Amino acid sequence: MTVAFAAALDRSGQSIAAFLQPGNYFEAGISVLDPDVSGKDTSGNNTGDMAGDYYFPGAALKLQLTDKISFGLLYDQPFGADAGYSGKNNFVTNSVTDRALTAGQETEIFAGAQARAQAIFNNLTAQERVGAALRAQGVDLSTQAGQVQFANTLNAYNNSAPIKTQIDTAVLAGANAQANNQAQNIVNQANTNVRAATGGTQVEVDTQNLSFIFGLSPIKNVTLYAGGVYQTIEGGVSLRGNAYSIYNGYDAKIKETKGTGWLAGAAYQIPEIALKASVTYRSEIDHDANVTETGFSALRAIPTATAAIDAIAAAPAEKLTITTPQSVNLDLQSGIMADTVAFANIRWVNWKDFSIRPDKFGQVSEVATAASGGNGFNLINYTDDQWSVNAGVGRKVTDKWAGNVSVGWDSGAGNPVSTLGPTEGYWNLGVGVQYSPTPATFIAGGVKYFWLGDADANVSSGTVVGEFEDNNAIAYGLKMGYRF
């Protein structure tokens, strides 16, 4: 049974076990994952189950062309994500209460408005201050009576300190009130913009792999293999709710794109004692993807950012380079008694160097972080590499029936984690059974239960926005094989 659930975006585990089967061999299978992942946002609201069920098929064909040369074609879906929030929480749009800006950002807007009001006041002449004070009292300065009152008040302003203080205080208060109204309008407009979005936060990522493997056995029991990998990737993300602040309403659609990479490895086998050992390296694969991005209206409402956001929105988007990670698989198997084998798999995936920063998202993040250096941030990234271990025992019960039990552990890819996949690693326990109606055919099935690691969920800027605990998943797998 394939991995089904793992750190970051890992899914299939990228096994090449089918290629190391003796003779000619074909298999096809499917895995189904039913996760239950829920938590609370920082306001104490329940998120409900945000993890979507998904299934992914796999297939493999291995041909023993000569005694020393073999060829394999493997299909799998190595990476992916499927998640969506619903209900009433900070990851779902609320058309009444959503706020586009953090309390700190709102404070900055009001402070900036008041600073501008103070600067304008400081540059006013005595005549302008007196005129502003009288107009605030309803005096019409275009009339003769108004001009007389203006002259008398200006004389008093210039010759009486108490009157000067009184007028200055009133004019500055009026300027601050006007500035506060303007700042409030900015905040209100930003809130209106994000409240126009609908639905909950969602993410979907799909990949497909075709591996073309050529093997050479230069000496008995040893196989060297290498080949090319063709991969496609597509996906989309929608950010909704207060948790995402100015990015509430952001959408990105990644069109399907293709890339190529390679794999290489070596295997050592002694069939007489059911011994197998193999190590496989898979390269990273670059994808230059076209991305459609929308939803920057909240930040545009801030006067200091309007021009920059308009320029970003109007400019053609650069292609997004997505690099799926390199990995290493170590597979071990050995007979430990008659009709009984022990097996283990160790997998490393280089998630620490993986990130996604769409062009416009990245530019907007640089504008949003201008006050702190303007370095911006990624839409998705991970802080650690993934390590996973699966080990178990299989036993042939009769000529037609066999079974196995296994236990697994996954390190996760760091904590805090993205709100789009808020778990950190797992432990699992699995059982499987295989029925062979003929020596050349079999049907195998299995089930695994996952205890998912607790995690704090953060948004792209690094702010923790939720806590996810006591989650689990169950996976099912079915596979059929044929030797010919």
Task: Label the model's feature ranges.
Residues M1-A6:
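Gram-negative bacterial Sec-dependent N-terminal signal peptides
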Residues A7-F19:
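N-terminal basic/disordered segments at the start of proteins
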Residues L9, G39-D41, F56, K68-G72, ...:
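Outer-membrane beta-barrel porins/channels
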Residues I16-L20, L61, Q269, S334:
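A general structural signal for short secondary-structure junctions and capping/turn motifs
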Residues A17-G39:
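Transmembrane beta-strand segments of Gram-negative outer membrane beta-barrel proteins
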Residues L33-D53:
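Surface-exposed strand-loop-strand hairpins of Gram-negative outer-membrane beta-barrel proteins
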Residues D34, A51-L65, G72-L74:
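Long, well-ordered hydrophobic secondary-structure segments characteristic of membrane-embedded
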